[in-house]
Amino acid sequence: MSVFDLPRLHFAGTATTRLPTGPRNGLVDLSTHSVVMDGERFPASRPAAEYHAYLDRVGGKGTAFAGNGYFAIDAGITAVERAAGEVDTGDLLVGRAVDVWGHYNEYLATTFNRARIFDVDPSSSWTSTVMIGQFGFGRLGRSHDVGYVFTGGVHGMQPPRWHEDGRVLHQFTVPAGEDMTWFGSAADSPAAARLRELVESGEADGLVVQLALSDAGPAPMPHAQQWRLRGTIAPWHAGEPRTCPAGRLLTPHNLTADLRGDHVSLNLISFRPPTGISGLELRTADTDRFIARVPADDPHGVVTVPAAEGGDEALCVVGTTAAGERIVVSREREVTVHVDDASVFLEHPRGPGDSDQDAEIAVRTYVRGEPAAATIHIGQYFNPRAFPLDEHATAASATPEDLDVVALCVDGTRWSRHCVISTDENGDGRFLLRGARPGATRLLLSAEGATPFDGLTAAAAYDNDDSLGLWSGLASVAVRVLPDHWWMDDIPRDKVTFDLLYREVFAFYELLYSFMGEEVFSLADRFRVETHPRLIWQMCDPRNRAKTYYMPPTRDLTGPQARLLLAYLRAQNSDVVVPVIEPSHTRSGTPISTRTDLVRALRHGVAIELAVMLQYLYAAFSIPTHGAGQELVSRGDWTPEQLRLMCGDGGETTDGGVRGSLLGVAREEMIHFLVVNNVLMAVGEPFHVPDLDFGTINDTLMVPLDFSLEALGLGSVQRFIQIEQPEGLTGAVRLGDLPVPVREAEDFHYASLSELYGDIREGLQRVPGLFLVERGRGGGEHHLFLRESVNAVHPDYQLEVDDLSSALFAIDFVTEQGEGHVLTDEDTGEESHYDTFVRVADLLMKERLTAADTRRAQWSPAYPVARNPTVHGGGQSKELVTSPVARELMVLFNKSYFMMLQLMVQHFGGSPDASLRRSKLMNAAIDVMTGVMRPLAELLVTVPSGRHGRTAGPSFELDEKPAFIPRADVARRAISLRFRHLAESARTCALVPDKVVRNLDFLADQFATEGPR
């Protein structure tokens, strides 16, 4: 039965929570989604800084106002138990890590995903819920050194259980299925091998994991708490509780027991007897018959001890006081109720008969630990602290009956503030929940009609401070009914302005959660919101509410609010001008054996990764945006099917069409550029930024491939296929008995990019004494665009390179994304870059053939952008852009491109071993990419170039090479001044979007005040 089954793995360590404390101050009115200042509703239109200053004055921020909701553990396995009562500390797993991670984010393609903790009711002390997306154990150090033994997916929320005296328990299951992976190293651990055998044979249906947190205190990082952590991993069987501890419940000082033959297993993971009590014994409650000794100091939480026959009596734990008096410490609650989904968010119904927003709650009843039929009474107890603006709810005399947050029902017809259900012989039952008014409440599920809260006031019955000490051992459900926002669906979509969006959606979170403004960007900045529409929607899409990365992490964004947000973001994406196109009548070489050759090859790898990223970006930008594509459809130039093919659905899902696929590949190439640089820096070289000239680049690289900036089409896609071609498709050429040509020593060319990386990989292993950085100080760590297959096996991977193992893994990682089947031979279901371009080529050819069969006019999937555009001229392989407007925009783009690279150079020059993902400089570089370069590029491809039949495009030309500025104060002023000049230049060009100017102003101000870090 759950954690009582064998084998068990015990672990311990610490847990860190970054739960935001601002909303817990009692100044948040959940019925209106508003905040309170001096007893009145604070207007959402007023600056958030004004409200933050008020909270400072009244002490309303708490200790973690900037908490971001992250939940993390640092734990290791302390013992395994394969036979009852036999604790083994010699198993291979002992000392190995236990990890909880968040869900994989398909849009950002992230590793190192954090689990979450959030309050269902932020005004309550009882509803802090954990959400975990991935669980694993078995790594030793980094997973590419000694990997995981097991990883698996986790679903749903993990409500708090057994809240008592600063202790709390969370439980979750990892069900068997496609999200579960046992690695080969499981065979080396008898305990892991047995767990695997049970699951794969069907004797068990997955794993169950308990986390017990206690003794909270300040954490080393700001806005966080650190807890003592103990936990247990055991087999799980379908039909057993997912989030509730199984067994016979004894309360208070909660523990559960499982009597089997001559022994009893006790779940003491959260048990702590009263001070001064010793000699704990498990006895029968009525006849006082001794059953077993209860160890009070076991380090593992779940223990098995010899036991006498228990019979059919209830159980109790008896102890002895310092004065020698025997007292009952805990007594069995003979009828218990389990509700796995005990953290509930309800959308407010549209009207009295709206059943679409109802929630069905599954219940299971137990009698002395075994499923059995029972009659259960369900009542509700609203939280007065959730209604600070309601004088009736907060009155000292208010009773639980004065306010109904939900209506309850068994049959779907008779709704009431309470209900009674009868479970079947298996203990199973269900009831329905419907929102009655916005706010927060708690449901009590009890086998007795009378409750210990009868006759108490609302505040006393809710017992936020646990004065009564009763709720911890009772079955309850935390319910949040979201505000009634259905009126937002009636707002005409063309009337959705940013001011309206901020007031009705963003303001609440800006007022209460500062981590967005401090760690990401402020939702009050219109230009930042308009810069990241797809990112914002993917995080806020209601379909992702069950994912850990969902925003807001509080999960209280209503459906109408989400649709209002989507309407605004789509409107911004449609605000484009489409040009009118009018017809006109007029490996295989000498192995790398020296450091010099290896460094040269790595620098070529860096140059190639940057070059392929830029040409993929150019091809992606040549495709009209979804908004522009809609205009082309309305003009009859595109069909709706062609719009879907090229641009996807406009951001509602992750389907970005061919354009989205190209951008996704380009993002991964940017990571390749960084990770190959990480290898280069690990061998003692500086961060390398090549100066690429697409007019001459093909004469300078080690691979005989064609690199150029040109529009997306069948020709360019075929070039991309050739670049990403796997090594197996490039072989030696033979003719009869003629010998295979052998390259000369000075010939450093390769047949493919794959051959180059293969040679680098061998060189890393061949050349001695390469790595000069200290272990753990590789730097350059980041976790974006790393794919779910990497996250499944290496959720801790963040690109660092500091030794041979991590360098080889980095090269394999780059090759895996390009070719596939490098890190694993298994089919991950993910496309390599090669596969992506083959698919795109097939789609384009299919569309061309369809057009020919239906005698449709020839279709172009892209704007007629110039091939290798330039503002400088020089050579027939580049097209000189002569239009003054286009040239002005190209110069602005190129200077922004320089600044993006300068910021990277400045980071690696000044802080080479610092976190890249936390770097102000790198984050500013990303802001330049997304907030300046992308909108300028999307504009440039629509502007006439001055050459017949061609539009302009971003040329990625550098007038000077970025170089590290050693003095931090000089660097700060220089960077700020350059951004200021760029902002002024952008301001004088009427075509430049306002958000670009604002982003440049923001960056100039940021470096003028903060400086690079």
From Swiss-Prot:
It catalyses: 2 3-(7-chloroindol-3-yl)-2-iminopropanoate + H2O2 = dichlorochromopyrrolate + NH4(+) + 2 H2O + H(+); 2 2-iminio-3-(indol-3-yl)propanoate + H2O2 = chromopyrrolate + NH4(+) + 2 H2O + H(+); 2 H2O2 = O2 + 2 H2O. Coiled coil: none annotated. Its EC number is 1.21.98.2, 1.11.1.6. Keywords: Heme, Iron, Metal-binding, Oxidoreductase. InterPro entries: Ferritin-like, VioB/RebD_dom. GO terms for molecular function: catalase activity; heme binding; metal ion binding; oxidoreductase activity, acting on X-H and Y-H to form an X-Y bond, with oxygen as acceptor. It holds the Pfam family Ferritin-like. Its cofactor is heme. Belongs to the RebD family. Involved in the biosynthesis of the indolocarbazole antitumor agent rebeccamycin. Catalyzes the hydrogen peroxide-dependent dimerization of two L-tryptophan-derived molecules (imine form of indole 3-pyruvate (IPA)), to form dichlorochromopyrrolic acid (CPA), the precursor for the six-ring bisindolopyrrolocarbazole scaffold of the rebeccamycin. The hydrogen peroxide is provided together with iminoindolpropanoate by RebO. Homodimer. This is Dichlorochromopyrrolate synthase. It comes from Lentzea aerocolonigenes. The lineage of its organism: Bacteria, Bacillati, Actinomycetota, Actinomycetes, Pseudonocardiales.
